[in-house]
Each structure stands twice: as C-alpha cells, then as structure tokens.
Amino acid sequence: MSKRFWLTLPVILVLAASVTACGGGKGGKSGITLTVGSKDNTENHLIGEMYALILEDAGFKVKRQLSLGGTAPTFEALKKGDLDLYPEYTGTGLTVMLEQKEPEKDPQKALEKVREGFKQWNLEWLDPASENATYGFAMKKETAEKYGIKTFTDLALHSKELVLAYPQEFDVREDGLPGLQKIFKDKGGFQFKKQFQIDYSLRYKPLENNEADVTVSVGTDGQIAGMGLVQLQDDVGFFPVYNVAPLIRKEKLDAAPEIKDKLNALAPLLTDSAVQALNWQVDGPDKKEIEEVAKQFLIDHKLIKG
C-alpha cells in the first residue's frame, strides 16, 4: 500500500464522518421518517403539503401520500400506520369518528373532546388553527343586499323567494336542510322557491350562471373572497366548529417531540381569510400548483427557508 494512500486515508475518514453527521439531517437527528397524508380536496392537500415542507425543513425525511380520498380512507390509513399524520378537523373528529350526536359550537370544548376521545387510537391532536371550515351559505353581494340578508334567520325569512343549490345529501341529513327546517319552522321554514342538487366541486357554478341565489358553502372556500360573495352569519349556531389541526400517531410524537413546536407554529397563520386566499390561488383563474402555493406561504411567513 502506497505512502500516498496512508496520507489520504485520514482525510477520507474525516470527510466520511462529516457526511454521516450532516447527511442524517434528512432523517432528523432521530432518523425518523414521517409519512404525511391528506384528504382529496384543495384545502386539506395544501395544509398537508405545508406539514410536509415544515418537517423537511426541520431535517426529517418525509414521504407524501396526499389526496388519499375522503375522511374514511385517510383516517383508516392513519390508524393502520400507513400514515403518521394528516390535517383533520375537530368537528369531523367529533361527529364522524367519535359519533357525537350534538354538534359542538365551542372550539375549546371541541378540542378537549377530540383529544380525550382519540386516546383510544393512540392519536394526538396538535394545536388547531382559528380558521373554521364549517358549512354555511353564500350569496352574491347584490342579491344579499336586495333582500337584506346577512344571517341564517334572514335567509329563512326570504327563502320562499330564492333558489338554493346544495351538494349531495344536504337535503336529507339532520345537520343539513332537515335540521334547519325544524329550527326555522315558525320563521319561513327554510322552504325555498326551488332547490336542486349539484356536485360538491361545482357548487359555485349556479351562482356564476345565475341559476341559483344561494349555495351551500364552506367558510374557507376560496370562491367566497375570489368571487366577492357574502358568507351568511350562522346566528343560531347550527353548524359545529371545524378547526383544522395536525392529527398524529403518538408513537412518532413521543420519538420526536420537536415535531409539536414545528407544526404548532403554523396554526395562528391559518385564519379564514388566509385559507380562502390560498384556496383561491389554486381553484381560481390562476390555477397555481398546490406545492408552489404552500411553499411560498411558508417562506413568506419565515416557517421554512427560501
């Protein structure tokens, strides 16, 4: 073996040690790989991508399984361990997974209930955002002003003069039209001049095409801000709160507790108006890529490096 090799060997060993120490950054100091999922709608996909980007920036190796489907397949994947975390809503946790009959209107109580209830699956809820992705009703500004409609009560009083568009099952679910009709049976009854069903993803088209006066909405829909619509106030507290939060397997959080602070830093930034604007960048005329929108938002708020 040559003298030159022996002189070079210490340098190689030092470099190898350095690479090993630094290269482990992609797997975090603990070497943990995290699989991040999401449901198959714009908002949930956006927030899931943000979780993934934040964790990657913190040094974790991240696998993405985004836009898996609806609540059922995504939650099952989490329970089975195919996912480690995904964005879920407190209202969904209560009414779907925990099967609570009465909707919870208080955000803090909703959080306390899901945190306690999800212990049976060894799952933990981190800090929820203030954004409330709950159901409601949206109208064009000129229509709302014409009839003086600002609240659900106002809508009930004028319902017989208006046309409603709604997504599948809204006319048969107790937390939809039937429940509202019971509440307002002496105030217009929530009985519309005409009502028709439309695919969930197309629910704003009838307003655009002047085929309906009112549509069922979600509080963080990008179309509300993008189209300049009026979101009616739920003055009777009919719909439960739906605050989004990271839902994560306890074993992963125990192994890397720093995950909590990293993801919790996002919560205060996800307000109704912020999420509406994010959704509109994807669903509006610009049709930006979800990955681009999520990354730029995090860079702008200094949650990840540019």
Predicted regions and their residues:
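C-terminal motif of bacterial Sec signal peptides marking the signal peptidase cleavage site
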Residues: 17-21
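Bacterial signal peptide processing site
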Residues: 23-26
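Bilobed "Venus flytrap"/periplasmic-binding protein-like clamshell domains
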Residues: 31-68, 130-204, 288-291
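An extracytoplasmic/periplasmic, membrane-proximal ligand-sensing/linker region
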Residues: 43, 175, 181-186, 258-306
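Short helices/loops that flank or line small-molecule/ion binding pockets
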Residues: 53-54, 72-83, 101, 179-183, ...
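Beta->alpha turn/N-cap motifs
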Residues: 70-71, 81-94, 110, 140, ...
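Ligand-binding "clamshell"
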Residues: 97-106, 111-126, 211, 223-236
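A bilobed periplasmic-binding-protein/Venus flytrap-type ligand-binding module shared by bacterial periplasmic
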Residues: 135-145, 243-256
